Regions:
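Small/aliphatic-rich secondary-structure junction motif
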Residues: 1-56
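Short beta->alpha connector loops
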Residues: 7-12, 92-96, 118-119
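Aromatic/hydrophobic pocket-lining residues that form π-stacking "cages" and hydrophobic walls in ligand
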Residues: 16-18, 75, 100
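A general secondary-structure junction signal
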Residues: 30-32, 90-92, 116
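A short acidic, glycine-rich active-site loop
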Residues: 51-70
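Structural beta-alpha unit
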Residues: 77-111
């Protein structure tokens, strides 16, 4: 499996290397660390009405998804031009990135690209 990592502070700089490493794989998994999950505040604010809480949480999730799409747009476009798919996963914090990578590694070999400067150790 090919996996690419990025965050706002650590963008994916090289799209050629993961594409070249695919060896016939049809899907690249892209993981975007959106940092702190501000949606949590929409879930725990006891003074806010339920509708406002849900709207805020949805807004935060939408913002994170838009950031992730923008961060991986060049990779998605390059993958599409080669007939490949890219699955985007938005997670919150380095712990979530580590957990996702650990789970995928239990399923098989994972080659990771990007993530330079991300605190994953």
């Amino acid at each position: 499996m090919i996996c690419c990592l990025a965050s706002a502070a650590c963008p994916l700089r090289d799209t050629a290397a993961p594409l070249a490493a695919c060896d016939g794989e049809a899907t690249i998994r892209a993981v975007y660390d959106a940092g702190i999950d501000l949606g949590h505040y929409g879930e725990v604010d006891q003074l806010a009405p339920a509708g406002a809480m849900a709207e805020f949480t949805a807004y935060v999730r939408r913002q994170s998804a838009e950031e992730a799409e923008a961060a991986f747009a060049p990779l998605r476009q390059a993958a599409r031009s080669r007939g490949m798919d890219m699955r985007l996963h938005v997670v919150y914090g380095p712990g979530a990135v580590r957990d996702l990578l650990r789970r995928w590694r239990e399923e098989g070999d994972v080659r990771v690209f990007g993530g330079e400067g991300m605190p994953l150790a």
